[in-house]
Design a protein with these regions (language model features):
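A short, hydrophobic beta-strand element within the central beta-sheet of small alpha/beta folds
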Residues: 79-90
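Acidic, metal-coordinating helix/loop segments flanking the phosphotransfer/catalytic sites
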Residues: 32-54
């Protein structure tokens, strides 16, 4: 089975590792970016991050909103599918629609996440 690369922007290393472990057996390779700093987000322009099929973004990355990160990425021309992961926040549905973001609750259902990725 060919692995599908996705990016996960998440400041909690344990959450990122759990996400990676949950998807690895389902043919998904998670490329972790640990913060929303410009130097880190620059990785999205470099292989293998640049060719990843989708980007998963935590709702809060330190003090930065995942929606702000998504908005910046869209304004920078990134057209890949975005998924916003949150443990309880209720993101603005209009903002999700405007930025073309799929909203997912934590903890993630890895079977559903892998199916959504495979359908891309």
């Amino acid at each position: 089975m060919t692995e599908i690369d996705v990016v996960y922007i998440e400041d909690d290393d344990i959450e990122a590792e759990l996400f990676s472990l949950g998807l690895s057996s389902r043919g998904v390779n998670v490329l972790h970016i640990p913060d929303a700093e410009p130097n880190s987000l620059h990785l999205l322009q470099i292989a293998p991050y640049a060719t990843a099929r989708a980007i998963f973004i935590d709702f809060w990355i330190g003090v930065v909103s995942g929606l702000d990160v998504a908005k910046w990425l869209r304004e920078s021309g990134d057209t890949r599918p975005f998924f916003l992961l949150t443990a309880g926040e209720n993101p603005d549905p209009n903002m999700l629609k405007q930025l073309n973001i799929t909203y997912l609750q934590k903890p993630a259902n890895y079977n559903k996440v892998a199916s959504a990725i495979s359908a891309l």
